[in-house]
A protein has these predicted regions:
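Short beta-strand/loop element within the Bergerat-fold HATPase_c
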Residues: 110-122
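Conserved catalytic submotifs in the C-terminal HATPase_c
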Residues: 46-50, 68, 73-83
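Glycine-rich ATP-binding loops of the HATPase_c
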Residues: 174-182
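Short alpha-helical segment of the dimerization/phosphotransfer core of two-component systems
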Residues: 20-25
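Short conserved segment of the HATPase_c
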Residues: 135-148
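Conserved micro-motifs of the catalytic ATP-binding
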Residues: 40-45, 84-87
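Short helix-loop "hinge" at the ATP-lid/N-box region of the Bergerat-fold HATPase_c
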Residues: 103-104
Length: 188
């Protein structure tokens, strides 16, 4: 290789860009594999009793600093006491992580993200609501399809697999994953 070209390629800015792109490709590949396994049911689940209230509180803590970057405020409503569910902790964490990441990317900057945990008729219910920064001109079913994003202009990074993975992982654990859209209100 020509020394001049090699010298240019080895500049820190080029290396940083190459590193970022390779990390993005790695993440996309991992997401594709996980989406495929989750939707086909080919994931081994390690079911255990999990306190959903505690897990969501921990998730709030994990994302709080990140949300502050976009001036998003988490407003939570939790019951007194625990809500124990039978789930795979790692897979359930991934569902929550995907939902919180979705809120971080697409919620209107400076707005609130509402997170509720409740028990209704013996069922644990997790709800997240936020106002979308851009109009949601897409159906809830389309949002959970692979490679579909609410940000049609694609101004944010992402593979369009997050909600699809979250839905598949929830269903794999015998849960329900429901999204509703009312104007620019997103609710999962």
């Amino acid at each position: 290789m020509c020394p001049m070209i090699l010298k240019r390629l080895l500049r820190p800015s080029y290396l940083e860009v190459l590193d970022q792109k390779s990390q993005r490709l790695k993440t996309l590949t991992e997401d594709l594999v996980e989406a495929s396994k989750a939707s086909s049911g080919n994931l081994k689940l390690e079911m255990a009793d999990i306190d959903l209230v505690e897990l969501v509180q921990q998730t709030n803590g994990e994302f709080e600093e990140r949300f502050e970057q976009r001036h998003l405020k988490i407003i939570s409503d939790f019951p007194d006491g625990m809500i124990i569910i039978r789930a795979d902790g790692r897979r359930l964490w991934r569902v929550l992580e995907n939902l919180y990441t979705n809120a971080f990317k697409y919620a209107q900057e400076g707005s609130r993200v509402y997170v509720d945990v409740a028990s209704v008729d013996g069922k644990a219910i997790f709800t997240m609501k936020n106002i979308s920064e851009k109009p949601l001109n897409i159906s809830p079913d389309e949002l959970t399809e692979r490679f579909v994003r609410g940000d049609v202009a694609r101004t944010t990074e992402g593979s369009g697999l997050g909600l699809s993975i979250a839905r598949s992982l929830t269903q794999l654990q015998k849960g329900e994953f429901v999204i509703t859209i009312d104007g620019d209100l997103f609710k999962a």
